[in-house]
A protein has these predicted regions:
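Acidic, low-complexity central loop/insert segments
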Residues: 56, 62-116
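N-terminal, positively charged, Ser/Thr/Ala/Gly-biased leader segments
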Residues: 1-16
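Anion-binding (especially nucleotide phosphate/pyrophosphate-binding) glycine-rich loop
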Residues: 34-68
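Short, low-complexity Ser/Thr-rich regulatory SLiMs
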Residues: 12, 51-52, 106-108
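Generic N-terminal amphipathic, Lys/Arg-enriched alpha-helix
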Residues: 14-24
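Short beta-strand-to-turn element immediately C-terminal to the catalytic PLP-Schiff-base lysine
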Residues: 23-26, 50-51
């Protein structure tokens, strides 16, 4: 099994600053236990896992111990990977999460999260 893992330092312009999060794009969901094991191995506060559903992105967050309902910096990190690495075309990214729909807009090289 292979997948890409990105580490993003949210709220920072330089490496080793800001709030780190790992971002893992998936084609299909892995078991909750495997997602948790990956998050533990990453050893950062939160790991974001996502699946691109076309009209929205299904997004889940895990700490090294549990799945959590909401994580702002890991959502922004995911948006950053979608736009800058995976070349997601829309300026607004809709995320489907345990906390409902979240939107991140990319404008003037900034990511703006509509936080509930």
């Amino acid at each position: 099994m292979k997948f890409q893992i990105y580490q993003v330092d949210a709220f920072a312009e330089n490496v080793f600053e800001g709030n780190p999060a790992c971002v893992v794009p998936l084609k299909k969901w892995l078991s909750d236990n495997l997602l948790l094991q990956i998050a533990k191995e990453n050893a950062v506060a939160e790991t974001a896992f996502f699946i691109d559903e076309g009209d929205c992105i299904n997004l889940r967050w895990f700490t090294p111990d549990i799945e959590i309902d909401l994580c702002g910096h890991a959502t922004l990190a995911t948006a950053c990977i979608l736009k800058r690495v995976l070349k997601y075309s829309s300026e607004t990214i809709k995320f489907r999460t345990l906390s409902g729909e979240l939107k991140v807009t990319y404008s003037n090289d900034l990511f703006l999260l509509d936080f509930p």
